[in-house]
Each structure stands twice: as structure tokens, then as C-alpha cells.
Amino acid sequence: MSNFLGSHAINMDAKGRLAIPTKVREELAQLCGGRIVLTANADEEKCLLLYPEPEWEVLRPKIEALPNMNKAAKRLQRLILGNAALMELDASGRILVPQTLRNHANLEKRLMLVGLGKKYELWSEESWNAYLDASAADEEMPPEMEALSL
């Protein structure tokens, strides 16, 4: 089971290559032999989703099973499945982010890799900081969170 936590500031070169931080690389090597899937996030937050291959193989059939006559479901399928790129970390722990995904998330040199338990999100540093600075006052809290104590 994945237990990805924490935020990591990383850099991407002009060719779209980025080095996965050592701690993350070691987790991915142990969990999935460094085989990952990188895809677009389907909501308004312009970031990418990075799944270890075993987690992706659990999620993918659920997305494929959505009713494709439903416009929202079809959009989700197109964004997530249509942008999915299976890749493997190279010997230096790097991946090459496809140009289409870089464009989707407005990725340039400075990035943030954010752990969310079973997956990572890959953000431009600028978008991540803007997200953190934004007010959550307009967001509706789900009932499940109202009883949560931190």
C-alpha cells in the first residue's frame, strides 16, 4: 500500500525531464519497480497526477466502466485515460514529462511534488503557492469532515 506524504520542491529541465527525489524514488522502486503513470487532473486545479502502476491498475477499470454516454463521465475518461503516460524511472531516477501534460498543468522549471497517500500531484510552483494562498472560505465542507479532529 502506498503512503506518499510530504511536499518536495523539484526542478524540470528545458527538455521536460525531472529527477524524482531520492526518498520518493526509493518508495516507487520498492512498490512498483519505478513504473508509474502520469496523467492530467480532471478538476479545475491544473496539476498532474502521478500513480504507481499498481494503484493505477486499480483505478483505470473504474474510470473505463463509467457510462460514456454521460458527458461528464466521458470528459473524465478523455482527460485521465487520454492523457495517461506509462513510464519508468531511468537509472538516475528521472522521468520525461510529455509536452501535452506540461502544457495542461502549465509546468515550467520550478515544480512541487505533493504526496496524497496513494498518489502524488505534480504542480507548477507558482500554481501550488497560489492554491495555498487562496481562501478556502468559499469551499463547502463535506459532512464527513465536520467531525474530523486534527
Swiss-Prot record:
Cellular component aspect of the GO annotation: cytoplasm; nucleoid
Span of domain SpoVT-AbrB: 7-55, 84-127
GO molecular function: DNA-binding transcription factor activity; transcription cis-regulatory region binding
GO biological process: one example: negative regulation of DNA-templated transcription initiation
InterPro entries listed in its UniProt record: MraZ (IPR003444), MraZ_C (IPR035644), MraZ_dom (IPR020603), MraZ_N (IPR035642), MraZ_sf (IPR038619), SpoVT-AbrB_dom (IPR007159), SpoVT-AbrB_sf (IPR037914)
Entry superkingdom: Bacteria
Keywords for this protein: Cytoplasm, DNA-binding, Repeat, Transcription, Transcription regulation
Gene3D superfamilies with a match to the protein in the record: Transcriptional regulator MraZ domain
Signal peptide span: none
CDD domains linked: MraZ_C, MraZ_N
Tagged with keyword Cytoplasm: yes
Localisation per UniProt entry: Cytoplasm, Nucleoid
Family named by the database record: Belongs to the MraZ family.
PANTHER family: TRANSCRIPTIONAL REGULATOR MRAZ
Quaternary assembly: Forms oligomers.
Protein name stated in the entry: Transcriptional regulator MraZ
Organism: Marinobacter nauticus (strain ATCC 700491 / DSM 11845 / VT8)
